[in-house]
């Protein structure tokens, strides 16, 4: 069945891990009649969590699209993971949604995941609605949670449905719009008398009326005259407030026991904006272009998620903003400027894929086997090429080195990782030019563990992880002059080269070469060979075999043989001079230093500063950021940062994040030299290069 954009609601379901997002999505799907049996996260039978790792871990790891069709309205629910290592799912889903349904556990209250979901909605100018789950449990405290929300989310919070525990221990739900109460028997709604909740009832009605009055001048006037709003006025005012961002309505219920979900679904329809009201703003030739959900307009479709399947191929999840998308549509990729050949169009519900002739404006679907399109791309009618903004992903700061488990799989790793990165843009992969290690980056330990499992299960590539090597450097502290004399007689022409070279420390991280030879003791045509020998030798320091930096080599004197001297002979002579001089020039180890910017709540700044000092770092200052966090700026050795991702997450309960970028090299403390040298020996860094 096709839906007009006014009858489509695209909703990101977000919140803390374990708060009940997936169970709520499953319950709404079951309520719509799309499934005969309600799945359970514990059993691995929900529509949302179908990935083998999700089933094994009993937690969402990827965003999934679950369309719920109910009473003429299509709700495209995008179930986002709540675990902090998988925030990419919410970052993708928000790009396809007009609204965010924030789930809050009736047991745990307002946790960090709920705060992050609220902030994500604010940043992206999306309508917000809260659903407090598990309110039928004995230890659930709705009104305590409501106060938490007012503190964390501010004055926009407005309760619309509240629970009341009855004498028999069951829970009834009071709809403040209609001022009627209901209990649920086997998921079926039964109206009852409104339970007595004391002074709270009048206070809740008053607070709701005030919030609604502020959305419209006529309603404000009626409110001040002391007149009660009609149910229609309440709904209209509430909808206006939700769509403008003035009001965050709060509902509650139980997904497991199918309680108050009918009220939630009804109000998702009447309060949240439809796909027809959500205009997108793209860019064409540097100018902003507004796109409306008009099926007759030129095609504009956004790729918000990619799944790499080794059997089916690439599956691109798409929201059509205007026009219609079908396999015969002409489309240009705004990023590449090239035509994009479209595969078959699909509707998707979890892992279930169904062919559909087209995806209409405002709706979400998928396209198979797009050749070049990736997440964040815009597909357009060639007559109107518009680029929409790319998703903003969390920063991947947790780095590990890749080690192939099976011999012969080395060539498969980069290809498999490239496929994985298509579906998870928070995974990064590079080959370190110096250490030659393959480095994979992600959001944390769990993130990389799941990435490894996907590589094995999807692409048959098994890898393990190890701590990345630190790219140390070596330098010298004082000047030293030495001779390098290379003489070899092998019958016929021999080899002869003789040089005196002065080695001295200089500023910077390069190798400088100069010559100060008088009288032709070393012919000019051999100067490049001497420089080449010095530079080759400097690739390996004498302490731990790391590259030498901050050194100047000056050719002072030497001698040559008119027959036996050659370029190779002077290269070897320069290397011998290097090996003779550097041990006497006060060799030192240098370690890389990075600039740390840790974004943390104000309460955590003292702990961060202490941790920086503990890690041999220096705090440089502190400034607020645009999100209300404090940015602690510091410089810290790279070697001390390997587990900082885990530390920061535990300290801030997931609220904080950081960036870390290389700045320069500094002298390694002498007390640490022996350990680094020992590690270098184990790696074979000190192999003779002659």
Model-derived segments and their meaning:
Residues 1-690:
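Structural and coupling elements of P-loop NTPases
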């Amino acid at each position: 069945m096709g839906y007009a954009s006014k009858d489509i609601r695209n909703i990101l379901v977000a919140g803390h891990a374990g708060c009940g997002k997936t169970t709520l999505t499953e319950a709404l799907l079951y309520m719509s009649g799309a499934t005969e049996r309600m799945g359970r996260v514990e059993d691995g039978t929900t529509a949302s969590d179908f990935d083998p790792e999700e089933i094994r871990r009993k937690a969402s790891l990827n965003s999934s699209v679950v369309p719920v069709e109910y009473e003429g309205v299509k709700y495209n629910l995008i179930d986002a993971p709540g675990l902090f290592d998988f925030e990419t799912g919410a970052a993708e889903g928000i790009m396809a949604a007009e609204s965010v349904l924030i789930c809050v556990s009736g047991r745990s209250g307002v946790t960090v995941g709920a705060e992050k979901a609220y902030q994500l909605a604010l940043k992206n100018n999306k309508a917000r609605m809260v659903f407090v789950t598990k309110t039928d449990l004995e230890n659930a405290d709705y009104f305590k949670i409501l106060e938490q929300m007012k503190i964390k989310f501010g004055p926009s919070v407005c309760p619309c449905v509240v629970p009341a525990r009855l004498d028999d221990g069951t829970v009834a739900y009071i709809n403040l719009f209609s001022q009627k109460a209901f209990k649920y028997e086997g998921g079926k709604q039964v109206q009852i008398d409104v339970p007595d909740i004391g002074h709270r009832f009048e206070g809740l009605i008053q607070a709701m009326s005030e919030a609604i009055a502020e959305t419209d001048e006529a309603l404000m006037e009626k409110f001040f005259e002391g007149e009660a709003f009609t149910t229609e006025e309440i709904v209209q005012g509430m909808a206006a407030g939700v769509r403008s961002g003035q009001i965050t309505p709060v509902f509650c219920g139980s997904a497991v026991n199918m309680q108050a979900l009918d009220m939630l679904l009804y109000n998702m329809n009447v309060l949240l904006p439809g796909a027809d009201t959500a205009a997108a703003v793209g860019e064409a030739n540097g100018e902003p272009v507004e796109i409306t959900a008009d099926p007759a307009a030129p095609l504009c479709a956004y790729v918000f998620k990619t799944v790499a399947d080794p059997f089916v191929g690439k599956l691109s999840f798409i929201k059509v903003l205007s026009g219609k998308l079908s396999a015969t549509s002409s489309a240009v990729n705004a990023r590449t400027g090239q035509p994009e050949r479209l595969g078959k169009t699909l509707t998707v519900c979890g892992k279930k894929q169904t062919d559909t002739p087209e995806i209409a404006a405002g709706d979400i679907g998928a396209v198979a086997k797009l050749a070049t399109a990736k997440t964040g791309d815009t597909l357009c009618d060639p007559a109107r090429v518009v680029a929409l903004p790319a998703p903003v992903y969390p920063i991947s700061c947790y780095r590990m080195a890749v080690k192939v488990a099976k011999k012969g799989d080395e060539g498969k790793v980069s290809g498999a990782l490239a496929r994985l990165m298509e579906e998870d843009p928070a995974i990064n992969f590079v080959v370190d030019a110096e250490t030659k290690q393959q480095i994979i980056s992600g959001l944390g330990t769990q993130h990389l563990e799941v990435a490894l499992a996907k590589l094995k299960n999807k692409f048959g590539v098994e890898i393990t992880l190890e701590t990345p090597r630190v790219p140390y450097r070596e330098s010298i502290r004082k000047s030293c002059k030495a001779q390098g004399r290379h003489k070899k007689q092998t019958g016929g022409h021999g080899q002869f080269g003789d040089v005196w070279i002065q080695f001295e420390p200089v500023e910077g991280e390069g190798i400088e070469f100069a010559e100060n030879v008088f009288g032709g003791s070393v012919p000019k045509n051999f100067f490049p060979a001497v420089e080449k020998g010095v530079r080759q030798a400097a690739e390996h320091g004498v302490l731990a075999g790391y590259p030498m930096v901050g050194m100047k080599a000056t050719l002072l004197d030497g001698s040559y043989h008119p027959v036996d001297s050659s370029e190779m002979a002077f290269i070897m002579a320069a290397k011998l001079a290097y090996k003779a001089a550097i041990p006497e020039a006060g060799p030192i180890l240098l370690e890389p230093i990075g600039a740390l910017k840790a974004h943390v709540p104000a309460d955590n700044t003292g702990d961060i500063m202490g941790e920086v000092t503990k890690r041999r770092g220096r705090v440089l200052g502190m400034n607020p950021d645009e999100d209300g966090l404090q940015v602690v700026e510091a410089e810290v050795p790279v070697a001390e940062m390997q587990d900082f991702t885990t530390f920061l997450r535990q300290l801030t309960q997931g609220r904080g994040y950081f960036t870390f970028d290389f700045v320069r090299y500094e002298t390694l403390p002498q007390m640490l030299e022996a350990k680094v040298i020992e590690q270098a020996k184990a790696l074979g860094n000190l192999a003779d290069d002659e």
